[in-house]
């Protein structure tokens, strides 16, 4: 794969994270406007998020790796796949892109660019959900890269689609996305004061996934037969 310079990779990370957040926030606004049924609105939000992830990881993965997520970049840095400098640059790009994505979604629906959320998302169940969501996402990515690299876009999109429904938090699983969603007082928002719990849980879940997958994906050492002097040729 061709190596792209850091500037291009950071632009790809900002663009991908921004479009991801625009899809999450925008589809939430659209769904909330079209139906009073929260379950139906979540279905719409889920489909849009899963679909855009498949597209973004496919088209931008060869450019930057398509992290779009500080937790993923941290894991890649800890595993030696990304330098500390590049990790810091990726995170800055992801956060900037994510906030821009919220503003873009708002402008498309004729709302103020940024509007602090008042939606409460806190408590042990929510934090556990975010830890599980991030754990599963990172495990999916690492195992996907190890065994089926070409399937990673679909694996990520399908995992997040499922995690929207089996986690109480609807699977943010991404500190940059969580921060950006604190700037929208709409269906997908999160109160700024609830961010620390989410971010800490996401980072812990990601690091735990790295620790487990490092061991799990390590093949067993081959058995070397020792030849005795009597049986040696």
Swiss-Prot record:
Disruption phenotype: Disruption of the gene results in increased tolerance to arsenite but not arsenate. Does not affect sensitivity to antimonate [Sb(V)]. It is a multi-pass membrane protein. It holds the Pfam family MIP. Signal peptide: none annotated. A motif (NPA 1) lies at residues 69-71. A motif (NPA 2) lies at residues 174-176. Coiled coil: none annotated. It is found in: Cell inner membrane. Keywords: Arsenical resistance, Cell inner membrane, Cell membrane, Membrane, Transmembrane, Transmembrane helix, Transport. GO terms for biological process: response to arsenic-containing substance. Involved in resistance to arsenic. Facilitates efflux of arsenite [As(III)]. Arsenate [As(V)] enters the cell through phosphate transport systems and is reduced to arsenite by the arsenate reductase ArsC. Internally generated arsenite flows out of the cell by downhill movement through AqpS. Can also transport the highly toxic methylarsenite [MAs(III)] and the relatively non-toxic methylarsenate [MAs(V)]. May be a component of an methylarsenite resistance pathway in which methylarsenite enters cells via AqpS, is oxidized by ArsH to methylarsenate, which exits the cells via AqpS. Belongs to the MIP/aquaporin (TC 1.A.8) family. NIP (TC 1.A.8.12) subfamily. Aquaporins contain two tandem repeats each containing three membrane-spanning domains and a pore-forming loop with the signature motif Asn-Pro-Ala (NPA). This is Aquaglyceroporin AqpS. It comes from Rhizobium meliloti (strain 1021) (Ensifer meliloti). The lineage of its organism: Bacteria, Pseudomonadati, Pseudomonadota, Alphaproteobacteria, Hyphomicrobiales. The gene is aqpS.
């Amino acid at each position: 794969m061709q190596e792209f310079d850091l500037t291009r990779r950071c632009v790809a990370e900002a663009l991908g994270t921004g479009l991801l957040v625009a899809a999450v926030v925008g589809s939430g606004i659209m769904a909330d406007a079209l139906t009073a049924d929260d379950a139906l609105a979540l279905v719409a939000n889920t489909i849009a998020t899963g679909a855009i992830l498949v597209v973004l990881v496919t088209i931008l993965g060869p450019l930057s790796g398509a992290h779009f997520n500080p937790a993923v970049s941290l894991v890649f840095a800890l595993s030696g796949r990304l330098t500390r400098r590049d990790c810091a640059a990726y995170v800055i790009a992801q956060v900037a892109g994510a906030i821009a994505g919220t503003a873009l979604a708002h402008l498309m629906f004729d709302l103020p660019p940024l509007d602090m959320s008042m939606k409460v998302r806190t408590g042990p169940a929510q934090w556990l959900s975010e830890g599980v969501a991030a754990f599963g996402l990172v495990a999916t990515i690492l195992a996907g890269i190890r065994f089926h690299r070409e399937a990673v876009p679909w694996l990520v999109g399908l995992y997040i689609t499922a995690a929207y429904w089996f986690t109480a938090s609807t699977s943010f699983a991404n500190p940059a996305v969580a921060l950006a969603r604190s700037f929208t007082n709409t269906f997908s928002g999160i109160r700024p004061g609830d961010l620390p719990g989410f971010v800490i849980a996401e980072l812990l879940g990601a690091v735990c996934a790295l620790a487990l997958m490092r061991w799990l994906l390590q093949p067993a050492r081959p058995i070397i037969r020792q030849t005795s002097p009597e049986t040696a040729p």
